[in-house]
């Protein structure tokens, strides 16, 4: 069986292009095209690359910020890297007049705000009174009347071999929002960014390329929530952006986006989505440019009095995919798990959500969730309410298009515990498997915890795994985490906090003999702390492949972990 696909490394990103899946004819499987087309899904640049470029769009950089932006840069090579970090301070756009979105569905609006729905939105004036320009398709709306606070600020850093550097954007600029452009003189640089505040923490990979479209399956502008879209244009030319949003009751195109929102060249702009799509429990989003390219992050703070609480950041998806892999998950009295699947295309998407339970010989094999998702709309499945998954049994998940219409999928996992691992984690899955994954951010310092979950989706081939810590200029094997065997179809959770004590500079590399998917959990454990960050790492393009078809065979594995040691509990 050979499902490997070559990955072409470009300065602007990575392309995993048009490779047929060669299947075993004896298995009576059809040969199918399986691609990750023109994807800027973050992948690690090879050590031999001439340069590395990363784009970290989202975060705040002032004393009143709710998502302090910190960039973590890891040099995985044996040589020093010269790195330039450019911080782009930005403004948050004020509400546009009549900011509620216009419903695209003529019958929509039954569940909306009567005073604001259906009203046409006037374009906002910019800071200096410039007139809007005519462009193809209609008027352009200048970004906002709050000018960017300062010019971009650059700092040069030398990162020693196999070392990492953390840089808060507040060290360079003061602004309501700030983005970072990270450039190095060679390959082997992996960059993540974190958002932190009293509301929680989250850490995710930055982008390795810009795009002319970005999609988000999940979002919320409910009364006790705040959703901020951060639009980062690192290029000299202006970008003109349109946006459309799927809510629980309709599809909306806010006036400021319908006319074309201008994001000036070399700037960052924050959009409080609640100004345009007010008080909606569910908001899926698509942003497309008429001109130019962007990087877009979504930051959400949820502070429900008796419900979810936490802080999350997520890079958008530049291209919907046919499959999304989630290595980790659980449903219980303490943990609520939801999946949101969004169809930004113009065709009906038939989707299956398949589950692989730990110890299936004991816990069974659940039937998949089947969804039919209309063009431009989304579906949410609450696994706690669905009832097909046994409580307190960790599992992996594959969200797959059954009719080859690509989709965007996110997992929403929340913990309402009074203490310990609690908070809100929202992430896309991985559209690829890879034999190597890197995590630049991480800590096992006091009142912190870190673990990883590995899933081997191959229905036939086991994989052997090594876990290495990149600390203090060395790449060191983690004790008791070498030559680990993950059988076909199985997953494995590893508690790094047990093996690596009190390291606040912990970066991790996971290497396997076969392609796998790896998720990392970061948690804040202090009595007054809240923070739960779960997401995939940065895969190597070498040996990357798209996932196989689901396997229904039961696996025989005993993880040996108590529930409290599981990655999300």
Which stretches of residues belong to each language-model region?
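Intrinsically disordered, low-complexity Pro/Gly/Ser/Thr-rich segments with frequent PxxP/GP/PP motifs
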Residues: 34-37, 102, 107-109, 144-175, ...
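Hydrophobic, ordered structural segments
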Residues: 157-202, 276-306, 386-418, 508-529
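Extended non-catalytic domains of envelope/secretory-pathway proteins
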Residues: 263, 268-289, 295, 301-304, ...
């Amino acid at each position: 069986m050979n499902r490997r696909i070559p990955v072409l490394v470009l300065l602007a990103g990575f392309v995993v292009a048009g490779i047929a899946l060669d299947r075993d004819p004896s298995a009576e499987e059809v040969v199918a095209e399986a691609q990750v087309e023109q994807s800027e899904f973050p992948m690690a640049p090879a050590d031999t690359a001439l340069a590395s470029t990363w784009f970290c769009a989202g975060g705040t950089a002032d004393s009143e910020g709710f998502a302090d932006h910190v960039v973590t840069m890891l040099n995985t090579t044996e040589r020093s890297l010269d790195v330039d970090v450019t911080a782009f301070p930005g403004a948050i756009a004020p509400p546009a007049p009549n900011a509620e979105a216009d419903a695209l569905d003529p019958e929509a609006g039954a569940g909306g705000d009567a005073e604001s729905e259906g009203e046409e939105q006037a374009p906002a004036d910019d800071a200096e009174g410039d007139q809007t320009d005519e462009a193809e398709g209609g008027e352009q709306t200048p970004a906002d009347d709050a000018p960017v606070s300062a010019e971009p600020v650059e700092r040069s850093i030398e990162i020693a071999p196999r070392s990492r550097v953390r840089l808060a954007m507040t060290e360079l600029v003061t602004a309501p929002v700030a983005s970072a452009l990270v450039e190095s003189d060679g390959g082997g640089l992996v960059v993540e960014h974190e958002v932190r505040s009293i509301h929680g923490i989250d850490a995710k990979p930055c982008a390795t390329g810009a795009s002319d479209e970005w999609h988000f399956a999940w979002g919320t502008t409910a009364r006790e929530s705040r959703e901020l879209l951060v639009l980062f244009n690192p290029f000299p030319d202006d970008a003109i952006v349109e946006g459309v949003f799927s809510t629980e009751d309709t599809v909306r195109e806010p006036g400021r986006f319908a006319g074309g929102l201008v994001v000036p060249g070399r700037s960052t702009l924050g959009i409080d989505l609640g100004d345009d799509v007010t008080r909606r429990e569910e908001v899926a989003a698509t942003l497309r440019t008429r001109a130019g390219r962007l990087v877009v992050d979504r930051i959400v703070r949820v502070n429900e009095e008796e419900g979810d609480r936490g802080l999350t950041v997520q890079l958008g998806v530049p291209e919907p995919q046919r499959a999304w892999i989630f290595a980790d998950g659980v449903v219980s009295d303490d943990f609520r798990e939801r999946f949101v699947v969004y169809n930004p295309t113009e065709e009906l998407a038939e989707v299956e959500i398949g589950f692989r339970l730990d110890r299936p010989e004991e816990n069974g094999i659940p039937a998949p969730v089947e969804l039919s998702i209309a063009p431009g709309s989304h579906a949410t499945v609450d696994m706690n309410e669905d009832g097909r998954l046994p409580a307190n049994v960790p599992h992996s998940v594959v969200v797959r298009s059954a009719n080859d219409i690509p989709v965007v999928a996110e997992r929403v996992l929340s913990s309402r515990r009074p203490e310990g691992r609690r908070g809100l984690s929202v992430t896309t899955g991985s559209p690829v498997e890879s034999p190597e994954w890197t995590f630049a951010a991480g800590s096992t310092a006091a009142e912190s915890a870190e673990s990883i979950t590995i899933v081997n989706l191959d229905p036939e081939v086991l994989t052997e795994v090594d876990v290495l810590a990149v600390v203090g200029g060395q790449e060191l094997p983690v004790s008791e985490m070498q030559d680990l065997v993950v059988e076909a179809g199985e997953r494995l959770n590893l508690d790094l906090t047990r093996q690596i004590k009190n390291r606040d500079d912990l970066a991790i590399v996971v290497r396997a003999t076969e392609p796998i998917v790896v998720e990392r959990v970061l948690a804040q454990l202090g009595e007054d702390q809240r923070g739960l960050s779960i997401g995939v790492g940065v895969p190597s393009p070498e040996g990357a492949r798209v996932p196989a078809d689901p396997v229904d065979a039961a696996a025989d594995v005993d993880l040996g972990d108590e529930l409290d040691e599981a990655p999300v509990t």
